[in-house]
Amino acid sequence: MTPGPPALRQVEAEIAAELAAVRPGLAAAYAAALPDARAAVLGRLWRGLLYEPLPGVAEQGPGRVRLHDGRLLTGPARLPHDLDPAPRPEDRPGAGTPRPGTADRRATEAGGGMAVRVDGRAYADPADLLAALGLPGSARLAADLERSTASLALSRAGASTRDVGREAGWEAGWKLEAFEQGVVDGHPYHPCCRNRPGFSVAEQLAYAPEHRPVVRLDLVDVPASRCLVAGPWPAELTDGDRVLVPVHPWQSRHRLPELGLEPSAAGVIPARPLMSLRTLAPVDGGPHVKTAVSARMTSHVRDISAASVRDAVPLSDLLTRAAARLGRAAPHIARYLCGAAVRVDGVPSAEVAVLLREPPSRFAGPEEVVAPLAALTTRPASGGPPLVRVLAEAAGGTTGSTTGTTGTTGSTAGSSAGWLAAFARTAFTAGLGLLAMGIALEAHGQNLLAVLDRHGRPARVVYRDLADIRVSPARLGRHGLETPPLHPRLVTDDPRHLREKLFGSLVGTTFAGLVSALGHGDRAVEARLWDVVATAARRAFDELPATDGLRADRAALFGPELPVKAHTLMQIDGGPPGDRWAYLPNPLAGG
């Protein structure tokens, strides 16, 4: 039996009603976006069911999951790195036979073209599916999936139809904020990719980056004695012996009253939200502003702890010193310049805190632009291929690149391999070099940025957001680097934890997305692209001094299993806090 389009769930209907009141012109686009939003979130949930160690799951196989109670789930076969692109006309049911070698990304079901069957009954809605499964600890996640689906449909409905890259051209000096705001769908592998509980429709339209707003930050004025300040605080945010702390307007409305605070000046810093929503680029330039927003976005409440304020500057100094030792291969580090947290009842509050960070675009030279990797692998809201494929074709045409990698797209595959090889050399040299010294980056597509030349070729990398790196005092000490006082959460000498952090983010997310976006579902091309990635990693290891630790790191990177963050598992109630990992077949195995 083939299901019809699902009826609106409660949150979907609530957003539709609010949208009709605050932005009626988007109502039709929102309704049209819902089926594909359901398919996108369902695809992420299905990935988790296929590959993560979830409670209640007994067996996992290609397109099949057996539960402990004996029920059988079936759906599209997919590899862990597969992205869920916006449906193309040729993907629609009845549109013809898929090209040979193309991954079976979507079942020929109703709804958004994606369904998972439970003992033969099809589910096209992710929240419906999870509720029917009844996995232990999954009730809150089911509600989050409903919100994620509805907000994703809103994001797609409101996204600009501007075509990233093609409209502006590299010579135009395209701005970082435009790349960031082009990431409409959020995290490519997280089922709660657009979960924003606590944000109304009006607030999402006013503050979310994909809607391209200008957000006006407030200021809270407090005596210096009532504020924890780390680093050199800027004079323009000082008034005599008082500190002016930038605050997000959502926070001013929803949290400051409960803390006994109010803005001393409202809407005085116009800024554009970046991919993370709570980090903004002031319209007039200067440091980026990372604000506290006490709401759960994707999966975490986005406060800024006192420890993060204290650690920001010394951690920036450590990374900058370590990176400098890599010479010409060094990544640029977008440093935290300073931070502040207002004391409430004598204690620095995570809800009234801020960090100021160098803008990554400062590392771009003439005729260069800086773009987060996540912006390169996402499919533009206007349709068409991911931007990285456009870049690869342009770079290949400029250089005349031929790598011998051919496939469904002919010479385009060779261009893709050439672009990927250039980026992989830079990324692995930086990531593995820092790992050898004792610093494991969380190098996923939001934190890792590429400096692109005027032809779209990767020249260097920039790393930002130091809150989730890991630091090994033992490794640092062997390289003559002293570990500053840091929160214990950041510090570990366990090589497994260091490798999970770097390999899971750089390979399991960043390169996974690039291979999927460039390979376009052609498994033969994807395999050759993974070979390109492995070759770059081998060369990066070969250029580092041979040590026992390095040899162990190398064996782990090319071992049979790759750690990948278990995003779905981490949303299940009852588990331990912190990172959880799934160990999956490693596409670099044997390299």
Q: Which residue stretches match the model-derived regions?
A:
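Nucleotide/phosphate-binding site architecture used for ATP/NTP-dependent chemistry
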Residues: 1-425, 453-591
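Conserved kinase catalytic-core helix
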Residues: 419-437, 441
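Canonical protein kinase catalytic loop motif
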Residues: 444-446
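Hydrophobic residue at the +6 position relative to the catalytic HRD Asp in the kinase catalytic loop
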Residues: 448-450
